[in-house]
Structures are given as structure tokens and as C-alpha cells.
Amino acid sequence: MRSLKLAALVLFLAVLALPSTFNRIAHSQSSEITDASEPTISAEEAASTAASTDQANKVSGDDDTASKSAVDNEGVAEGTSDTFSYDAEIDPAGASADNRTPPDIRCPQPPPIGKAPADFDNKTNGVVPQGTPVPPGDEGTLGTFEGDKFIFSVVDEIDDGLGPVYNAQSCRECHQNPVTGAISQINELRAGHNLYCNAHGVCSGTPCAGCSTLFVDAPGGSLINDRGIPTKNNNTPPFFGAKVQERVPPLYTASIIGGPPLLANEKVRTFRTSLNTLGDGFIEAIANQTLINIASNQSSATGGVVHGQVIKVPVLEVPGCNPNIPSTCPKRVGRFGWKNQHASLLSFSSDAYLNEIGITNRFTLHENTSLGRSVAPFDNHPDSTFVPCDSDPSKDCGEDPEEDIKAFAEFMRATKAPPQDPDIQATFAADIKIGRKLFSKMPDAAFSCSICHVPKILTSPPCTWINGGTFLLPNALGNKIIMPFSDFLLHDVGTGDGIVQNGGQKTRTKLRTPPLWGVRTRDRLMHDGESLTFREAILRHAGEATPAINGFIALSEADKRRLIMYLESL
């Protein structure tokens, strides 16, 4: 369905810079509005409600703490005891046994360990050839960086399967600053509500002493899509309305499609900023065991004060995986998304194509709802219609027969990592040298910023099978030292958005440590974009980050400035 997208691409590029406008709302459960007493339900009913309302989150992950995962079967070769080290300088051979394939015609002698390429130059990292820019009217050559980038950028229309509910019309719309695949200042909206369950298993919407908290999604899932395709008005045949448009309930009219008003007050609300996808191929190449070891090291070094949570999530592309039955899917340590929803870039692409653009595909074949209500009457491509994949007619590809999700994943795998700014670092060398040291030593090494914002990680070697044996790491991604400034774990640093997606209720107050590479290109910081300066973002931290924040507060004003100057160079 790519041909219909070409005419819209030029128009899309012309209007891309127009900002979206959002109403400011409460950004965490801490600002939740309380009502008068609400009806009570049993804990079993509450759990059933929580499980049944989240239609948008197709699969869920399991909690997998470091203490339960001393050795991961993807991360250690059979017959060895190699448990990896995440510190590339102390143990550069740490990530050396991730289901390794012996050298053969596909796997010549691997290159020595080296730094991952980092630049904003719109060039391949070597996973695929560069190719040539796609001329107007052409569909490009897939399997090249330029061809894959073109598909990543193409605008989807209704005839392509857009919607009926969606947030954007292309991947690039949310990932484009300063180059295609990078961050942007665009948010998505999520909502739900909390139930409070006492020791007798009775739950209500009223907080109570000693009660446990159970998050429940808004109808249809926590994601509230910003856009909806035009839908036909019943009594005005020539005109169209917006009956699939989602809003945060309560809604007191029945103006949305079907059924009565939605009266539940979804009091937990949050924005989520779009994430950087540059360098994601290197993140995908990190061994499970490396991430588990980081979590274990944090807990040991800080006496349990800092304790990143590892969760394992289904890898959708593994043969035999049914995304609707997570138990059928092999799992890997999550690392993509604010809640570590995915571990592979193909699974991540499939999820985003449905939830952000509204296009069903091979791994997510059912449309999202509009606040829990079917959009089938307004869907030009019914879920019940079998659409064969171009590459394999025996498989159903939904609204993506050309499998654009493969191009999305391949493009992200081929991007270079976000670079640091050498000009800033040279011009302010003396100050930034001190700032860098403070980042790793303030107030001490155990509780510094770098305990979570890990500066360096080594990827698995080339010829390592990852993602349940579906992807063989090439030389371009293997044995690479990356500088992401993240541990890719879930933490409670006092800014959790109150939303549960993966890993169960204990993740409600947790978020993935955002990588700081390229952070100087973002002017709205933290998960919700509510912090506008580095100082504001630092001071919002609490919880596990309390020792580091107290250390920052105790710094002289000159040293605070030096630390921020270092961040401004990343």
C-alpha cells in the first residue's frame, strides 16, 4: 500500500514542524483527584477488570529480578560460567557468550572490540549498505539505509490502513530531531485509575490506610490516542464527524461510538515523550545477562537502595508465538519503551505501527478500540479479512502486506548512536572535565548519577543469536562499546507515572532510565516533558536517586554549573 503514500510525503515534510497542542494535565498519580466514596468490589473482580481493560497493550512481561536470575540462558554459552561484565573498561571481554555461533561463512573472524560509530550524519552504521536517496515517485530499494529510512518516513493514509484511532502518520513524525530516527518534542497521552484493596480483598476508589494499590487502565487500554479518522454521521449523509475520537473519561454524552456515557473518572493521567531510536541496534545487541548483572551490581553496591528491576517480555517474531497468549512466546529482557515493553526492534516496530499509527500487521492483527468500543464499522480493512504477506502468502499481514515493520526495524538497527558534542567539550574542557567526574563520583561512586545512567556498555559479540534465535548479530553491531548513559532498567526515582504495562503492579511507580546520549537535542525533559531545564530535571528525582540528589544539592553553585555543562555536551 506504499504507492498511495508517496504523494503525501512532500506535504508531510512541509508541515512537520507545526507543533501539536496539548492541554496540561496532572502527570502522575501523586496529583490524582479524589472523589466522594465509590462503589467497592472484590480484589478478584478488580484484578479481572485490570486484565480485561488493557486492549492496547497486547502482551505483558514478567518480573525477573536479578536475585532470581543469576545466569540467563541467552546470556551464557552452554558449558561456560561467563556471566559478563557491563564495564567495558574493566572487563572488555565480558559479553562473550550469547548463544555464540562458531565462525563460518556467515561469521568470519569477528572484529576486535571497538567504539560504536556515533554521528548525526544520516549514514549507516554498516548493518546495511547506504544506498542512494529515494527520488520523488519511487518506492526505493529496501535493504539499504536510504530505502529503509524512506519507509520510516512515508506518510500513511486511510487507504493504507491508518487508524481508526492513531497518534501519527509516520514513524518520522515522532522521531526526527535533528535527523530521522532521533527524538522529538512530541508526547502521547495515557490514563487510568487506581483501586485500593484492603486486607480482606475489598477494593474501592477511595484511598485507605494499609491498602494495596491496583492500577486499572482506561477502557480499551491506558493509551488515549490523539487522533481519529472521520466517521459518518447517521443523520447527515454528506457530512462526517469524529465519533472514534478518544478522550480521557468521564464522558457524559454518548457522542462516541456506541453505548452509554463513560462515567468512570480516570484520575491517573500522564504524558509520555517520544524516545530516541538512533543507536537502538546496539541496545538490542546488549546481552540479557549484561542487564541482569547491572541490576545485581547496583543492589550490591548500594545496599539495596538502588535496585533496577529487570522484566522479561515476549519476543513476538519467534515462530509459534501468539501475542494474545504470552505463555507461547519466548521472552527476553525488556529494554525498549518507557516501561521496557519490548526486547526486540521488530516487536517494538509492530507494537508502534498499531498503537501509534493504527496499522495492523503480522504480529498485531487486531485494531485498537475507541475507549473499549469496537471501531469495526469505521475500519476500511476489517480484522477478519486475511491479507497475505507479500513475502509469504501463507501468513496474514493485516494492513501491512509489504511488512514495513521489517524496514522500520532494519533502519533502527542501522542507525549510528547519538554523538556527544566535541565543540562544546573542547571549548569548555576544564569545566566539563570536572562535570564528568562529578557525574560518576558525586556523592560517591556507589550513589552517583552513573549508577543508573551507565556511561559505557559492551554489546554481545558478532554471530550471537538473539531475540529467541531470530536475529544473528552482524559485525556492525557486535563487540561495540556504546555510551548510552542508561542501564535500561526500571527504577522508582519519584517520578513514576502511575501506569502499569509490563511486569505487574510493582512497576506502577517505575520508569526505564532514559539514555542521555543526545539529550542536548531535547528541550522538554523527563518522561512527561514537564521539566524544561537540566536543573529542574535533576531536582525532580527522589526515591532511589535521593542520595545522588542530596549530593547535587550540597555542591557549590560552580560545581552544579559544571555538572550541567557536561550534560549539555551529551
Summary of predicted features, one role per range:
Residues A7-S20:
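Bacterial N-terminal signal peptides
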Residues S20, H27-T34, E38-E45, S52, ...:
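Periplasmic c-type cytochrome electron-transfer domains
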